[in-house]
Each structure stands twice: as C-alpha cells, then as structure tokens.
Amino acid sequence: ITAKNSVDNIGANIKANEDLIISAKDISNLSTLRINGHDLDRISTGENLASIEAKNISLDAKNDFQNSGASIKADEDLTITAKNVNIDTIEENRYFHSGDSKNYLTIDNKSNISSNIEGNNININAKNDVDIKGSNIVAKGEANIKADGDVNIVSATDSEYLAHKESRKKKFGRSRSEETINYRTSNVASNVIGDKVNITSGKDVNILGSNVVAQDSGNISAKGNITEAATKDINYSYHQKTKKGFGGLTGKSVTEELHQEINAESNLYVKNKAVIDGDIKVLGSNLVLGDNSIINGKLTTDSNELHSSYSLEEKKKGFSSSIGSGGFSVGYGKSQSKLKEKDLTNAKSNLVLGDNVTLNKGAEITATNFTHGKVTVNNGDVKFGARKDTRDVE
C-alpha cells in the first residue's frame, strides 16, 4: 500500500497472509469510540478496534506514525520507521451529572484501551522521538527501539470520580445536608518485553511508571540521561455532614478529608549481560541487572516522595443553660475542634546487581534496598544515603 499523503486505518482491519508493506507521508492505525448520550449523560466505549496483521510488516512514514488503542501483529518481523512514532491509548469515559448545588450526583470515570504491538522481532526507528504511552510492545525475539531524539516509555492513567450531595429542609429553618466526594487513579503501565531489548536514544530515555523486561540480555544507551521513575496513584475522599437547628441558631458540622499518594513503580529487568550506556537515575523503582552487566554512566538511586494528609474538623453552635447559686442562666456559643495530619513517606527503590557487574562511574545509592553479587567499581565512589519519613500533627 503506497500513498503520496497518508494511509489511515480507522477502526478497520488490514490483513495479509504473507508480507505487508505500507509507505506514505503519514500512517495511522486508530481504534474508534462509540459515544452514546448527551453532554450531561454520556458514555464513550471502544467500538471498532483497528488492527494490522501479516507474516512480515513494514510501516514506513516520512513524517508521523500514530497507533492509538489498536493492535499490530507480525508472525515474524515488524518494522516501523517514521520521523515521529507515537503509540498510545484511546480513553473510554462515563460521565453523568444531575441536580444543582444543593442536591446532585456526578460520575466521571475514565479508562484506557492500550495499543498492542506484537512480533517475533520488532524494530521501531524514529528520526525525532518515540513515545509509548500505556501500551505494550512484546517481542518473542528482539525488541529494538531507536530514536535520534527522546525515547519515552510512560504510563497512562485510569480514574474514577464520584460526588454526591443531598440536602433536606424541614420546618422552622431546620435542615440537614451530606456531601461525599471520592476520587482515585490507577497507573496503566507501558510494557516493553523481549528476549533481547535494545533501546538507543540520541537524547534521553524516560521510563515512567512502566516496565522494560529483557528475558535474556539488553542494552540501553542515551547520549543524555536515562531515568527510571515511579509515578503516583491518588486516593482522595471528602465527607461533610451538616445539621442546622431552629432558625439556624443551632447546628453542627463534621468535615473529614483524606489525600493519599501511592507509589506506582517502574521496573527495568535484564536477566544477564545488561549494558547501560549513560547516566541512569532510579526513583522509587526497581532496577535488576543480572550477571556480567556493565553500567558505563553514573548510577543514582533514590526514593519517591509520597505525601498524604488527613483532616477532621467539627463545628458546633447553640445554647447552653446552667443552674447555680445565682439562679438560672442561659448562654449562646460556638466551638470548633480540628485535627490535621501530614505524612511524608519515602517509597524506596530496589537495586539488584548480579555477579561480575561493573560500575564505570561509581554510584550514589540513597533510600534503596541493595542486593548484589561481586561488583567492580572502576572509577568514582559508591556513596550510600538515607531518607527520613516525617509526620506532622496539629
């Protein structure tokens, strides 16, 4: 298939029993969403999932290659060549809203449909950047990713949001209300898996909330920096209950709020003979390099800071009475109590180095669980450090 401008496979299937070659200015393989409902009651779901299948596949775009929530499967070799390669997700959504500021229900849920790229040997080449988000690159043999610019292997995010408020009015100015908000996110990792994995960048390699697994050997090379870092999932809740008495002169309200950050680590695993060519930084994640591995740049590991908070506030107002030697007395007052907690937790990295591992520029290992065999340090020092968890209570 050859086109002067673009070849767009939108929600369709392209299949060849033998070889498939597509050449164009731009190439896209896009799944589609079905949208039902209207602005305040809307559901979008994956409907037509695009796919490309053949024994051998060659996709050659002079400009951009885009694969969104779609699959490409080669029985043998798969090659993707473009100026920019973007492999990402499509997002399903359930949105509903009903009511006003006093009585309402809101639902807003989002989930990702990943792209899946499969083959015996997979080769991805970009003159600029390779961006992989919330998707899977799985090779039975070799997975080779090369960019003159950045290689970004990052996660997508699923989320759930539910908010509900109910208010009731009674006689004589009395009322009750209750409001609840819950929100949480879930990391959707990208996965690059192969018997052998080779990643080469003319600039930086970024692995964020994702996994790179070489079941035999692997090579990661960057002229800039290599970063393997965790992302954060969020868990948030808010609950407020309010009661007002006669004429609004008496009342009580209780407000509780919770915010949690949860570590969503990356994993970089090479069974044996790993070559890390460039400075590498690992944050709140796992780095496992087997026997006979080499790190030619400086190795830095550290924790990922997780912040959590909790607050509980109670307010009261009303009348009080007492009987004493001076007679009967009536008073009116307000009271307030607060509890606030803030936590900083360091999610440690895990570093595992096998036997006969060489560090050619030393290492700084902080807040990290370190397991190792025989390690040789040719240049630089190995420094160890710690982080301190903290808690503030008011």
State where each predicted segment sits.
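Binding/recognition "hotspot" determinant
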Residues: I1-E394
